[in-house]
Regions:
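Positively charged n-region of N-terminal signal peptides that target proteins for export
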Residues: 1-4
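Aromatic- and Gly/Pro-enriched helix-to-coil junctions and flexible linker segments
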Residues: 16-156
């Protein structure tokens, strides 16, 4: 019976849960152009549609989207991994079907438009946001701000 003990301990070691994975670092630092895209396209989008739940007053999921540094840091799950859109949890949630439980913005909020999603994807991918796409995303963000100001919130 004694010879089976090392085998049993080895099996337990492989079956034990592994330590949580460390959050991956961005592939490379942001360029000045990427920082500019963030400031003119992405941050206004977040300010209009995300910061009320992910900002200084409220940090759902321990995620803040009110600054570039906070956005890149992420929350419980990493928000963005620049250069690796498939590893970016927030991006995945933005592209979920509107009926999915984890969709962002939540179902009861105004969804991001396709142009906003495309701009966000380009940013996370590490690519410059093309001018026409940036203009369309900015226009959609302005519409979302107007809608948020004029649409009454349902009482909870």
């Amino acid at each position: 019976m004694r010879p089976l003990l090392p085998l049993f301990l080895a099996a337990c070691a492989f079956a034990a849960p592994t330590a949580p994975k460390k959050k991956p670092e961005p592939v490379k630092p942001l360029t000045p152009a990427q920082k500019s895209d963030y400031a003119k396209v992405v941050q206004p989008m977040f300010d209009a549609q995300c910061v009320s739940c992910h900002g200084p007053k409220k940090e759902k999921g321990k995620l803040r989207l009110d600054t570039l540094e906070a956005t890149l840091k992420g929350g419980k799950n990493l928000a963005f991994v620049i250069g690796r859109p498939n590893d970016s949890m927030l991006l995945a949630r933005v592209f979920l079907d509107r009926t999915a439980g984890d969709v962002m913005p939540p179902k009861e909020e105004h969804p991001l438009t396709e142009k906003q999603k495309e701009a966000l994807y380009a940013f996370v991918e590490g690519q410059p946001i093309p001018d026409e796409l940036a203009k369309a995303a900015i226009a959609d963000t302005r519409k979302a701000l107007t809608a948020a100001k004029t649409t009454p919130k349902p009482k909870k």
